[in-house]
From Swiss-Prot:
Residues 30-49 are annotated as: Disordered. It comes from Conus marmoreus (Marble cone). The keyword Transport does not apply. This is Conotoxin Mr15.2. Belongs to the conotoxin N superfamily. GO terms for molecular function: toxin activity. Contains 4 disulfide bonds. Expressed by the venom duct. Its main location: secreted. The cysteine framework is XV (C-C-CC-C-C-C-C). One of its GO terms (cellular component) is extracellular region.
Amino acid sequence: MSTLKMMLLILLLLLPMATFDSDGQAIPGGGIPSAVNSRVGGDEKSGRSLEKRCRSGKTCPRVGPDVCCERSDCFCKLVPARPFWRYRCICL
């Protein structure tokens, strides 16, 4: 067996030991929430939604926080934006 395979095997065997505390209790996951989660969670806790924060009330989903449209008569369209495709507000 190569050295790399042997090290991977040892790490896989040690992995279950790393997830338990010394008394056998599982270590809880979660940890520190990301900035996006705390921002969204703070708005949900305060009863504010994105639609209430947008003056137009119209939003477009995208990766990460949503985008507020300028007016309520806008619509969302998937457009190419380097290097990905993104949702944009298209206002007539």
